[in-house]
């Protein structure tokens, strides 16, 4: 990694501002300066989010079991299309990905320029909410059945 890269290392995530002989200065997303000893960085896993020009945005979203799968996928597709700055190549991925106790899970994967990652992420979440409402898709809400025993 180099100055200007966005990394996760030694339990810290942020933008590298300086690399010196003894430590690396990282600025977090909430604008805190963190000075991390290079020995901590070198001894652990480093994720460089800036090394490639494009990044994949992954969102796992739930819908209630009472929704038609095709309707949910249609709504999610509409949300992706409505989200600016998503890339068409590689193509977006929208699939049913799991069954939970009270919900069906869907995975959405789209690609964006690294600099657009967070805007695409948050805009897509907002567009999913709008598309669910427009298509009548109901969210997943945990349910509870209570059985009352009658006194005899």
Residue ranges and their predicted role:
Residues 49, 63, 67, 77, ...:
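Solvent-exposed, non-transmembrane regulatory segments of membrane-associated proteins
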Residues 1-89:
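Soluble accessory domains appended to multi-pass membrane transport proteins
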